[in-house]
Amino acid sequence: MKKLSILLFVVFSLQVNAQEPEFGLFIGNTYYIGDLKPYSHFSQQDFVVGGIYKNNLSNGRVAFRMNFLYGRVKGNDFESGVEQQLQRNLSFRSSIIEIGPVIEVNFFPYKKGQFETNKEGFGTPYFFGGITYMRMNPKAEYEGEWVELQPLSTEGQGTSQNDNKPYALSQISIPFGIGAKLNLSTRLSLSLEYGLRKTFTDYLDDVSGLYPNQALLAQEAGTLSAALSDRSSSPEGFNDSNYGLQRGNPNNKDWYSFSGLMLTFSLVKKSSCPTW
């Protein structure tokens, strides 16, 4: 809640010089980069949808917007084609709620309502950056049901094996990327955007550290925790051959991408005709 309050303060502070408000929709696709998919951009994609509130400053060079987005990311060792990951056999999906301010900087002056292609201000490329509150919730499929992973302490967090507290589901991320926008009419605008998010957690996929002792984990955190901690184990019982080995790479934080189309509607009708 404290993180969200700070973001809202930033939002209202930036409204002082804002002009030309817009509301809009965002729809697109997602992917993640992390321990289960360390290198492959654009694979194992999922969806993102949400709402946008935007203000274009009167100079035509800068726009401020507030994102309210809901998306989902996923990763699966089985789809990696890497032998070590195939043996590890972990998978996850996580919903992401994202709320936060973003600043767009236009390459060329952009005029809301100017939809004549032969005139300045019709459209422009832009780049953007900001800061967002994100809420994640990694889950894994087990016996036909999706199970929340954070409460299970799959790496022994909060047990006698691991002094670390369970990781936080609420985080801050840094969105940035590029896009292009154009006016469709005096009120409608369309943008195409590619964005990455840098996070400060390595647990978007619930994978980061070492394999715990599975028998002890089952005793202290439950058999379900042990079953989802090491999915390379045989179904007949717990296999502690991986105990103490690297389950993930704690030195690399997780990333995700939200990319797609934005359709925005201006609250103030802007004429494309010159005034006399």
Spans of model-derived segments:
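Gram-negative (and chloroplast) outer-membrane scaffold detector with strong preference
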Residues: 60-62, 66-151
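Outer-membrane beta-barrel channels and translocator barrels
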Residues: 57-60, 108-110, 183-185, 268-270
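Outer-envelope beta-barrel architecture signal
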Residues: 19-23, 60-64, 95-97, 121-125, ...
